[in-house]
Amino acid sequence: MNKGLKENSTLLLTNGDVVHVNQLLGSGGQGFVYSVTVNGEELALKWYKNRPSAIFYENLQKNVTEGTPSESFLWPIAVTRQKFGSCGYLMPLKPNDYYEFSQFRLAKVRFSSFRAILTAAIEMCNAFKQLHAKGLSYQDLNDGGFFINPRTGRLLICDCDNVFPHGENSGILGKARYIAPEIVMGKNMPDSYSDRFSMTVMLFMLFCIDHPFEGYNVVRHPCMTEDIERKLFGEDICFMFDKNDRKNRPVRGVHRNALTIWPLLPKILQNTFTEELGKKKLASRELRLTEMQWIDILLNVRDSLVVCPHCGDEAFVNRESASCLNPKCNVPIEVEAWLESDSHSIPLIKNNLLKVGTSGCIIGRTIEKPGTIHILLIQNLTVKTWKVITPSEKTVIILPKGYFPVKEGMKVEMTTNDTTIRFTINK
């Protein structure tokens, strides 16, 4: 086993560029991570404790050549030549304001808002959608595999060296608590289907902080063995909020996060997690939601998230209920109208920002007309003109920064930088 690199030592990349090793940043099961300098640019170097196989090394070089599928990946950008009985690869350094997700689980770092959590969830799904679209699978997603900016929710996924084509294996099976039950039981090798399971586990943990399968079943086994782990995360895996099986419920005093947050989640999220982590889809991998289906659900949730006009906290509003996330606020939220399209249903209340797309692009905002009560205006915050068709079929052009009143039956064509979305205003 390689003991690592010394500070101020040098390496060569496969293209001949010189790597100057600065300092050790951390280490894990596979290797060490150093800050390094290449041609005046500071980067990160992962150096393997054991020399990877020839197949692994060739695949790493191939991933470097083809480039990252998404900006959300800290993707390999160069590979070193073999030296000291091992090798490594370069990747971008993570910014200082990004923290490993395990820090959130330990409450050392907290999200600034629920909207930031939603942003992280959407970015994760979008990154894996683009990865899988290139015929690749990540194979080893776990709570140490990504970093998040707690203020914005922007997300970076690391450890991308295990990415292999779908159906091929990197030699890394992943952690039993995060890999799909069929992998734990040895029925399949990691692929895009098992990625979707791991992604769903991480999404649940983003929202609820606790692990979806670590309820009473795990608490009653303080000494975890391989056989017990195989049973709890493979043969007899059970979601802590399974609709029919109560044997793995969260334990009071232990799973405070899950018990507190789960009741606050919108029904669409609760129902999706219950279905995706339920017995049927645990056993039938091909039935798992795709990344795009997850994105549609998360965008639906984001549409329903508003600022409570009474307390200023976040609130979920849909046609069935209007619940503020602040337990001290019990004032009902009145929705004046809904801005609806085939894929959006946005509640119109005062001081609400209108966002679309996976990036959460702000296209407009609602304000109360000065000197009035309950008369809302929508402002165009894009650089494009919008077209409004009134109930009397009159067409009105709304310039950037312009306003129009909210009236039932209006049809609105909102143009952003790259698309036009057709909305109808309904009561």
Question: Where are each of the predicted segments found?
Answer:
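Catalytic-loop of the protein kinase fold
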Residues: F128, H132-P150
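Glycine-rich ATP phosphate-binding loop
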Residues: Y34-S35, E41-K49
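Conserved catalytic-loop aspartate of Hanks-type protein kinases
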Residues: D195
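ATP-binding glycine-rich phosphate-binding loop
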Residues: N2-N39
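Activation segment/activation loop of eukaryotic-type protein kinase catalytic domains
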Residues: N142-P181
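Conserved structural core of kinase catalytic domains
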Residues: L74-A120
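C-terminal boundary/linker segments immediately following FHA domains
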Residues: I389-K427
